[in-house]
Each structure stands twice: as C-alpha cells, then as structure tokens.
C-alpha cells in the first residue's frame, strides 16, 4: 500500500528487512541521539545511546516482506496536483485521531480541492475538511488514514486516476507512493 524512497547520507553496510517500520522508528525515537549498528552478522540491530539506553531490534525474514521494484517508481499520469502544507497535514492527522475517523478523501468539487477526513462507511459520520487548492475537475480519491503516516513537512502531491498517489517532501529527499482505495473516482 505504501512505498517510500529516501536519499540519505548514512552508509548502510548490509541489506535487512523490517516487518513493522513504525514500530522500528518508534524504537529508534526512544533515544534522542541514537547510534544504530547493523554491521555485525547478527540478525538484529543494536540501537543505543551511549551506555544509558540500549535496544535489540530483530530483523524480519526477507521472504515475508514485499520488496520494492528494482526500477524507479513513476505515476502513470499526473491528473491532480496540490501542495499540502505541514500545518494542514498535522490538522488532518489530528482530526482523524480526535474524531476516530479511518478515511481520507481528496475531493474535487465546486472549484476547490479539499481533504476530507471521515468514515466513508457511515452516512452520519462526523468529518473534517481542509481546502488545499483549486480545480476544474471532479474527483474523489480515497485513502485509508493509516497509510498517511508521513514524516512531518510540506508535500507536493500528485495523484493519478490509475489509483496511485505521490507525496514528495519538499524539505527532504523523500517520496512516498501510496495506493488509493479501489472505490476512488475521477471524471476529469
């Protein structure tokens, strides 16, 4: 559902698989200045901060991980584009948490592009919306909010009517490709 590409300065001496990336990142965040050692022939990473904190995080069997493609990812088409500011992203994620809403829709109607957090299976669902741009197109691109766990920042968002979206972080060399839900619609 989600593929991330990042260009980093650190050297990683070997390939390894992480089954639960959010859990791994949260483990790393337990240290304010972590030192992560994956250089040994062990089946785990040593995550430490001086002598005060230490964690052993086991790698996953690579056969249970869906590997990214060897070729560079690209959208089949760029049908809708908008900028998603850091504050807007924070409000969307916070409203989803506060209201207990599982869905995010990027909706084009009445000349505007808006992000709507709701429960699409419930006709009487509360919702929260943020306008992020203008459009002359009509569409509803749907995501599960659980797939929108992005590193904080401003994103240039491009969405293809072929049910794939690209979120490019303008602060880092970081791109997410996120699959849309199959009930998304685009009238152009």
Language model region names:
Residues 1-58, 77-188:
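DNA polymerase processivity clamps
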């Amino acid at each position: 559902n989600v593929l991330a590409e990042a260009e980093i300065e650190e050297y990683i001496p070997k390939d390894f698989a992480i089954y639960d990336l959010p859990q791994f990142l949260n483990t790393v965040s337990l240290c304010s200045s972590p030192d992560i050692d994956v250089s040994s022939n062990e089946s785990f990473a040593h995550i430490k901060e001086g002598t005060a904190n230490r964690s052993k995080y086991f790698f996953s069997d690579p056969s249970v991980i869906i590997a990214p493609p060897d070729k560079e990812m690209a959208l089949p088409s760029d049908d809708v584009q908008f900028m998603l500011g850091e504050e807007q992203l924070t409000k969307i994620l916070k409203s989803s948490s506060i209201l207990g809403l599982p869905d995010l829709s990027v909706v084009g109607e009445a000349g505007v592009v808006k992000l709507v957090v709701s429960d699409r299976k419930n006709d009487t669902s509360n919702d929260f919306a943020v306008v992020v741009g203008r459009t002359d197109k009509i569409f509803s691109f749907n995501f599960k909010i659980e797939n929108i766990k992005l590193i904080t920042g401003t994103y240039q968002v491009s969405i293809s009517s072929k049910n794939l979206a690209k979120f490019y972080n303008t602060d880092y060399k970081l791109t997410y490709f996120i699959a849309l839900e199959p009930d998304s619609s685009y009238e152009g």
